Amino acid sequence: MTRANHASGTDRLAEVVEQRGWKEDAIVVNVQGDEPLMPVANIQRVAAMLNETAGADMATLMEPLDPADANQQSVVKVVASETGRALYFSRSAIPFRREGGVPALLFRHIGLYAYRAGFLSTFVGWPPAAAEQSESLEQLRALAHDAYIQIELAPEAVPAGIDTESDLAAVRALLGAEQ
């Protein structure tokens, strides 16, 4: 078990890596607990992305976001560069559309990360960033310290995550239907 007072799931994962004594170059994948239906192909892809991308400290995935969900704070949005480098994550609709309305192309961040074990040691040495605390998004600590987060479209759609009571009910219903 891990300590109960970690600032984030990434901090908790770093404790596990330290306890297990994993090598610095080991690739560690963290599937967020609120994404219980994560497709195996996505888990495999995020690990492969980190392995294939020179200089990347982390890798993660995104998927197109229904504009109707743009203003839901429980849905994390992401903006990425043309080369697949994550630029910012937010609970607000980003990028902002100056003309009003919802941006035409939005992406939802998927709660799945791959790290090199050595990077996790570096990450926990950084204090939480102001943006991380404001948005309650741990990946913003990495960006605040110029970490390179590689991101691409998920190979498979991610079924409903669990961010609200209604999400939990939907996942329970789905799992009950599969039994």
Describe the role of every protein-language-model region.
Residues 103-179:
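Conserved alpha/beta core of the MobA/IspD/sugar-nucleotide pyrophosphorylase nucleotidyltransferase superfamily
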Residues 24-25, 53-56, 147:
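Short, high-confidence coil segments that cap the C-terminus of an alpha-helix
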Residues 16-19, 79-81, 162-163:
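Short beta-strand-to-turn element immediately C-terminal to the catalytic PLP-Schiff-base lysine
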